[in-house]
Amino acid sequence: MATNATVPAAMPRVGPPLWLGLPLGVFFAAFVLVPMLLLVYVSLHDDSGLTQFGIAQYLKFLGDGFNLGVLGSTMWLGLEVTLLSLLTGFPLAYLYTQAPGRWQGPLMLLIVLPLLTSSVVRTFAWVVILGRQGIVNTALQDLGLIAEPLKLLYTPGSVAVALAQIELPLMVLPLITALMNIDANLRQASLALGAGHWRTFWRITLPLSMPGLLAGSLLVFASSVSAFVTQTLVGGGQHIFMPYYMYQQAIQSGNYPFAAAIAMLLLVCVLAVVVAVNALGRRSKGIVHA
């Protein structure tokens, strides 16, 4: 005797209602989209009175060698800070993933501690450390290594070092996530086959940690090129970068259209770097050398 079995229809998956995202959309529009559109609007004026539309501000910036030099110095600073953060952050992230569980908590506290303090406080700490009467110069003079204080502050190098320390958590945290997602069996298999620790690192660990490396690099680069406080206090205004240049044009000169154009050009350059790094990440995704 044949029996007919009735298979219940699958219940449609019901996601959260769209209105739950409304507060986030309003926040994004009010504090990101609208200010960005206003910035574009102001930059597209040829005069400070905002009466004549045009692209004269962009042509003025791109046609001046000094302006292009400021842009190039800012991009180079971002690259230096990113490399310094990577060279110090990768060993720290690797140390965290290899540390026993009881040590990971204190290590994580040390990593995120800079994020719990104001950037102004951290920057002033570097001013105290690198000043002519600062900790470094005082220690070197007490040891008899130098006769006169070294000029450590108000240099591009001091700005890069200070920013690398301040932005370090932005590099370390994505690297920790990427390193912890690597299957430990891959390293063990590589070592068992006689690859050695260095070869295993270069062939297995580094390629598989590339997503975290690229994410951290983008965060550090984007944050460092726009770090007005650190660039100004540690640099002393003697070396002009794009954020301080915007401040000069807007506050000191009252040339808001030109300042807005500077901001938009910096944004375009940062977005170009983001697109290029994302393209590199897609090409290198999943590549592990044999």
Language-model-derived ranges and their functions:
Residues 190:
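The alpha-helix within a helix-turn-helix
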Residues 53-62:
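A short amphipathic helical element positioned immediately N-terminal to and/or at the very start
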Residues 182-186:
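Short glycine/proline-centered loop/turn elements that form peptide/ligand docking sites
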Residues 4, 280-290:
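Short cytosolic juxtamembrane segments of multi-pass membrane proteins
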Residues 193-195, 207:
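Glycine/proline-centered hinge or cleavage motifs at structural transition points of membrane proteins
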Residues 1-14:
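Short, Lys/Arg-rich, polar N-terminal cytosolic tail immediately upstream
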Residues 13-48, 61-180, 204-228, 235, ...:
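Membrane-water interface segments at the C-terminal ends of transmembrane alpha-helices
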Residues 47-53, 228-254, 290:
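Glycine-rich helix-loop "coupling/hinge" segments at transmembrane-helix boundaries
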